[in-house]
Amino acid sequence: MILCPVPSEQIDRAWKDGASCLSEACETSGGEITGDQLKMILSRGERTLLCMREDDKTVGWAVVRVDQLPNLRSLHVTDLVAHNAGFERFFDALKNMAQHLGCSRVRCSCKEAQARLYRMKLGFKPVYTTLEVELP
């Protein structure tokens, strides 16, 4: 089980090789971002695409960014699609990546079902909840 960062100049190829499934994750963002917009952000190097591989097969895709905040540096998983791949099996590799990038935290954006799973299996804890109301 390894995480392979995809260079920004290889995003188009990765998209054709299956990373386009990240559009599914974008659909749960409440209109914040589309799959095409995510591809553009990745191509510009603003976030990093990770290929999740096991036994020489791609089993999932994730997108991360480093957030340098005033009191901490965090690796934030913004998008993830790994159908039945067990993302938690890749978590040690993700923590190692975060440490090598100088991060002291790993954060993720997710829905309630994933939040429960990540709390139980990976030790995540809620930091805050973001709510919104649409204006006319």
Pin down the residues of each PLM region.
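Short amphipathic alpha-helix that is part of the acyltransferase structural core
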Residues: 1-33
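Active-site rim helix/loop that mediates acceptor-substrate recognition in acyltransferases
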Residues: 28-47
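Structural motif
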Residues: 42, 54, 96-98
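Conserved donor-binding loop and adjoining core beta-sheet/short helix segment
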Residues: 44-85
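Short glycine-aromatic motifs
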Residues: 46-47, 119-126
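Hydrophobic beta-strand residues in large extracellular and virion-surface proteins
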Residues: 50-52, 106, 131
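Acyl-donor binding region in acyl/amide transferases
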Residues: 72-122
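Conserved catalytic-core motifs of GNAT/GCN5-like acyltransferases
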Residues: 125-136
